[in-house]
Regions:
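Bacterial signal peptide processing site
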Residues: 20-23
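A short, structured loop/turn motif at beta-sheet edges
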Residues: 43-46, 79, 125-130, 155-158
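C-terminal motif of bacterial Sec signal peptides marking the signal peptidase cleavage site
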Residues: 15-18
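Mid-length scaffold segments of soluble, non-membrane domains
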Residues: 68, 75-146
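Glycine-rich, aromatic-bearing surface loops/beta-hairpins
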Residues: 27, 148-187
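Bacterial N-terminal signal peptides that target proteins for export
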Residues: 1-8
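Post-signal peptide N-terminal segment of mature Sec-exported envelope proteins
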Residues: 28-53
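Short amphipathic, basic-aromatic surface patches that mediate peripheral association
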Residues: 52-64
Length: 187
């Protein structure tokens, strides 16, 4: 009986000593044929989940008379963002010019129509081949440089993407409330 108790204490001491011995336990397990499986390649990982929030202002996409109207928002899943960031606004008004500008980086495009004051919140799925989630707001009179954004997919997955859509500009925030609009001039 005393031998069994001594053996149990010895085994417990060895196990506890292995916890602080820089992977000796892992090496021992590997020697017996037990090891941690290798990390999956990106193509085999499940798609990323991104909390997407589009918050439209009551004064959304104002026309020349100052009246709010519906806004087409395009959501892009891209491999890279270079072509997206270099394309002029007019390229996004024509499907063929859009495809030509984005080339092989374009994985998927989807259009969402927003009405003034609407909140659109959804969990968007991004395949691992998508490096960026990009958005274009097709305003009637877009403010210079405030009608598109591209966010790294990993960042979007981690904190979500909140966009405020206003009279002629888009604001980008990572929290549940859209960032405030700085002063911009509508064209």
């Amino acid at each position: 009986m005393r031998t069994i108790s001594s053996l149990a204490i010895l085994v417990a001491a060895c196990v506890l000593a292995g916890c602080g011995s820089n992977g000796l336990a892992a090496k021992a397990m590997e020697a017996t044929g037990l090891r941690k499986p290798p990390e999956l390649p990106d193509a085999q990982k499940p798609p990323r989940s991104v909390a997407l929030r589009l918050h439209a202002s009551p004064k959304l996409n104002v026309d020349k008379r100052g009246q709010p109207i519906a806004l087409a928002v395009r959501l892009y899943k891209l491999r890279q963002k270079d072509g997206f960031e270099q394309a002029p606004y007019a390229a996004f008004l024509n499907p063929q010019a859009e495809r030509d500008s984005l080339g092989p980086d374009l994985l998927e495009v989807r259009e969402i129509m927003l009405v003034p004051g609407q909140r659109y919140e959804v969990t968007e799925k991004l395949g691992r081949e998508a490096g960026y989630l990009a958005v274009v707001a097709l305003f009637q009179r877009p403010a210079e440089g405030r009608w598109r954004t591209a966010v790294p997919a990993a960042d979007a997955e981690r904190s979500g993407l909140t966009l405020g859509l206003h009279a002629c500009a888009m604001t980008v925030g990572g929290s549940s409330e859209a960032a405030t609009l700085s002063s911009v001039r509508c064209q």
